[in-house]
UniProtKB/Swiss-Prot annotation:
CDD domains named in the record: MPP_YbbF-LpxH
GO MF assignments: manganese ion binding; UDP-2,3-diacylglucosamine hydrolase activity
Top-level taxonomic group: Bacteria
Organism per entry: Vibrio atlanticus (strain LGP32) (Vibrio splendidus (strain Mel32))
Cofactor: Mn(2+)
Protein name: UDP-2,3-diacylglucosamine hydrolase
Textual note on the cofactor: Binds 2 Mn(2+) ions per subunit in a binuclear metal center.
Amino acid sequence: MKTYFISDLHLAPSRQDITDCFLTFMKNEALEADALYVLGDLFEFWIGDDDTSEFANSIRQTFIDLVNTGVPCYFTQGNRDFLVGKKFAKQTGVQLLDEVSTIDIYGQKAVVLHGDTLCTEDIKYLAFREKVHQPWLQWVFNRIPFFIKKKIVSKVQSDIKDDKQTKSLDIMDVTQQEVENVMKQHNVDLMIHGHTHRPNIHSFSANNCTKTRIVLGDWYTQGSVLVFTPQSFELQNREFSNRF
């Protein structure tokens, strides 16, 4: 019995090594899972569910194949693929989760999320996030011709890259108070998230209870998977050699 959690793969046609590692994982290990959770930023950038490129279709197909074997797949939108929507879910069979969701893992209650909303000191990003998550703006964007959307996203990507180079690393990490607030709000002792690219397992005390926060790793130089069983959990790496 195993449940897998992954995030921050940043899949893109330019990184075939990441894609190959992901596809191998999906066609092998994932087949044995009780469930697979993707906690955001599966894609480097998802322009919209109307992306019918060969690359996008290959990723869709791997989810279709896995779901058809009976393995449930859950998807949380990240800051780079927040436009993954109901059409993608219907096409692939994945189940879209709320921005912050409470789940049961082998009898243990946990809160799962991408993690960007925990970085409360990054005021500039949170303001940008609030704008692009407005339903009316997404409604308009989704109706723009795809080739125009690609140009818009290319400009946004460039601006994001420039902005990150001038930011302090500290403000791009979570704030402990927000972590505790979310865990208290959802009445859990376990949180799982990605986003920060700082894989680790943190234990701390709050409200006279021991809490655990698991941070998923990114896939920039190697794959990263949280393997959760009824008895234990462990962050594991996967080399880009495709050997599992």
